[in-house]
């Protein structure tokens, strides 16, 4: 079982959780700073309004302020699934955490 960190709780990041969970991996979805409300909702209901479907209750949903802690946990795979509004944010954050 691999630890997979998916950054972005939108359509792309959330859809990627399905094959990961189906293959027995431990999945954490970390929202961008723009997705705090979505993370709160997913954590409570496990229903993704945009995808119009339930997501696995095995997924750990976290807000963006938990990024550093998640990177220190050394995930086996990091998937960046943010849209164009979030790419600058995550690029800077990953650069600061992984390469400095």
For the regions a protein language model found, what residue spans apply to each?
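NAD(P)+-binding Rossmann beta1-loop-alpha1 motif at the extreme N-terminus of oxidoreductases
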Residues: 1-54, 59-62, 66-69
């Amino acid at each position: 079982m691999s630890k997979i960190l998916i950054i972005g709780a939108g359509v792309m990041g959330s859809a990627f959780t399905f094959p990961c969970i189906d293959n027995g991996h431990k999945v954490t979805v970390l929202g961008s700073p723009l997705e705090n409300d979505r993370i709160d909702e997913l954590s409570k209901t496990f229903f993704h309004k945009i995808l119009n479907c339930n997501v696995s209750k095995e997924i750990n949903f976290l807000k963006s302020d938990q990024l550093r802690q998640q990177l220190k946990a050394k995930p086996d795979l990091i998937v960046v699934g943010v849209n164009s509004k979030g790419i600058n944010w995550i690029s800077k954050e990953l650069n600061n955490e992984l390469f400095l």
